[in-house]
């Protein structure tokens, strides 16, 4: 098992776990309703050099040369720049949106998405991806990690608590309530 920075060649391997992680948000960020259009839009976003879902913000976990899981992380203070790229792409396709709702606070190294393909679940891959992201965040000088977990996902909430994340607020995002959780990494 290795964890590494994603590359453009990973585009086909990251789509399934990314869409699984985004769940109901997949249509909001893509501006699409049909599954094949959603997949095409996230492939397009992934191949960009900038943007929230650019390959530059992904780490992948490989098992036997297959992508077993992904984590998407970026600095929260960079999100306006990252989102402007995505918003321009959406506007080109007639989806007019000025901004996305805010899902984090200032000065956080934010875990946007985390998912493990079903064939690889139960092997501790999600934990390893999170630990890897925390290490990278610390190396880059960030002091705090953050993530959101849906209010109904008690199992995930419990796992994050065991990893040292603490709920500091609740955020309503597109009509759904999420726990905002943070962990100091300095």
What are these regions, as identified by a protein language model?
Residues 60, 66-75, 110, 115:
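Conserved beta-strand in the GNAT
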Residues 47-60, 77-81, 110:
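A short helix-loop-beta-strand connector motif used in the catalytic cores of GNAT acetyltransferases and
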Residues 107-109, 121, 130, 137-148:
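Conserved GNAT acetyl-CoA-binding A-motif
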Residues 23-46, 57, 90-92:
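Conserved GNAT-fold acetyl-CoA-binding loop/helix
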Residues 2-16, 24-28:
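A short beta-loop-alpha structural element at the N-terminal edge
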Residues 62, 89-90, 94-96, 114-121, ...:
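A short, internal acetyl-CoA/4′-phosphopantetheine-binding micro-motif in the GNAT/acyltransferase core
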Residues 75-109:
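Conserved acyl-donor/pantetheine-binding loop and adjacent beta-alpha core of acyl/acetyltransferases
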Residues 91, 107, 142-164, 170-186:
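C-terminal "cap" of GNAT-fold acetyltransferases
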């Amino acid at each position: 098992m290795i964890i590494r920075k994603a590359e453009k060649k990973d585009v086909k391997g990251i789509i399934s776990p990314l869409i699984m992680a985004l769940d109901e948000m997949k249509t909001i960020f893509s501006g699409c309703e049909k599954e094949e259009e959603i997949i095409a839009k996230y492939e397009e976003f992934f191949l960009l050099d900038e943007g929230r879902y650019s390959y530059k913000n992904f780490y992948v976990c490989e098992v036997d040369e297959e992508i077993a899981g992904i984590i998407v992380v970026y600095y929260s203070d960079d999100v306006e720049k990252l989102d402007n790229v995505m918003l321009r792409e959406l506007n080109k396709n007639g989806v007019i949106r000025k901004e996305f709702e805010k899902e984090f606070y200032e000065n956080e190294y934010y875990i946007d998405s985390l998912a493990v393909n079903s064939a690889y679940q139960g092997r501790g891959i999600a934990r390893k991806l999170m630990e890897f992201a925390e290490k990278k965040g610390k190396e880059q000088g960030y002091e705090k990690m953050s993530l959101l977990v849906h209010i109904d996902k008690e199992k995930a909430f419990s796992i994050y608590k065991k990893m040292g994340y603490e709920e500091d607020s609740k955020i309503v995002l597109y009509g759904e309530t999420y726990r905002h959780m943070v962990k100091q990494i300095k």
